[in-house]
Amino acid sequence: MAQETTRDGSDSPSGSVSPPIANGTNNKKDKKSSKKRAHSSGERRSSVSKPARDPSDKPEESPSKKKKRKTTSSTAAAAVPSTITEEVSPSTSVTRSPSPVIDFDGLSRPSRGTRERLEETEAQKQERLDKMKGAVRTLLECIGEDPDREGLLATPERYAKAMLFLTKGYQENVRDIVNGAIFQEGHNEMVIVKDIEVFSMCEHHLVPFTGKMHIGYIPSNAVIGISKLPRIAELFARRLQIQERLTKEVANAIMEILKPQGVAVVMESSHLCMVMRGVQKTTSSTITSCVLGCFESREKTRLEFLSLIGVNR
């Protein structure tokens, strides 16, 4: 009788079947068969019992994808240092936090030059003021005015002091403004402070833009004193700004300070650089927004906020 050589090298009679290599394939088939039987027998899947999801929300990720993303993010975080050292002068360096808007000592960014204003002596303050007065006097002369005439004698000093006031947000401390006014209330519904008057200076032409800001957030149990939201808005407005960045900085600061589920900021303003010069469109307004967290991922939540502040009516 003819013989065949089996996988292990031994001879076996022709026509006989070699024993299976492993039973892994059979086990998989058995599992699939049991799943089909369970489905056909009317057994409920666990996903059916879950509450209905808003179709506009982002789909939930499977546990394996979440685990993979968590591993990736932790690896990326390990590659980024927790603090960043930035050279301020040849003799000193400042260790900066990874925050996009708040520096290591609570000052809001950019704060490299303005930290000097916070720490300077009275003599240094007067020296700064005198330097600014001289610059304003030069501007008056360059436009053809007489800085020594009666109406302009005190203008250089007035303008210098006004400019220091309008940019005082650089040297204000976020921690001092919040002053510990964060309370664990177990509240998880939307909080909105709307129609906050905002005055800022366009960094391109050094003329004002004014308008209203609406701030909303959904807490993660902790709430902030409602007066702190307008104060945070003013802190970032009292500097040279553009509206897009101002909107984003306010949202990022609240997100960092409070760690809520999400933050939404909408601002509508009129820019004098577009009203008094350039295209000279007096009735135009500019609207900007920044949505973070659940306001970004859930359309239903975002639309509720816009409806409550009256934007989409």
Swiss-Prot record:
Pfam (any one): GTP_cyclohydroI
Enzyme class: hydrolase
Compositional bias (Basic and acidic residues): 1-10, 40-64
Keywords: Allosteric enzyme, Folate biosynthesis, GTP-binding, Hydrolase, Metal-binding, Nucleotide-binding, Zinc
Key word Hydrolase present: yes
Biological process (GO), any one: folic acid biosynthetic process
Binding-site residues, Zn(2+): C202, H205, C273
Chain intervals with Basic residues compositional bias: 29-39
Biased composition (Low complexity): 11-20, 72-102
Activity control, per UniProt: GTP shows a positive allosteric effect, and tetrahydrobiopterin inhibits the enzyme activity.
SUPFAM superfamilies: Tetrahydrobiopterin biosynthesis enzymes-like (SSF55620)
Region (Disordered): 1-120
GO-annotated molecular function: GTP binding; GTP cyclohydrolase I activity; zinc ion binding
Chemical reaction(s) catalysed: GTP + H2O = 7,8-dihydroneopterin 3'-triphosphate + formate + H(+)
Pathway terms, separated by semicolons: Cofactor biosynthesis; 7,8-dihydroneopterin triphosphate biosynthesis; 7,8-dihydroneopterin triphosphate from GTP: step 1/1
Family: Belongs to the GTP cyclohydrolase I family.
Subunit and partners: Toroid-shaped homodecamer, composed of two pentamers of five dimers.
Described function: GTP cyclohydrolase 1 is the first enzyme in the biosynthetic pathway leading to folic acid.
Name the UniProt record assigns to this protein: GTP cyclohydrolase 1
Native source organism of the sequence: Neurospora crassa (strain ATCC 24698 / 74-OR23-1A / CBS 708.71 / DSM 1257 / FGSC 987)
Originating gene: gch-1
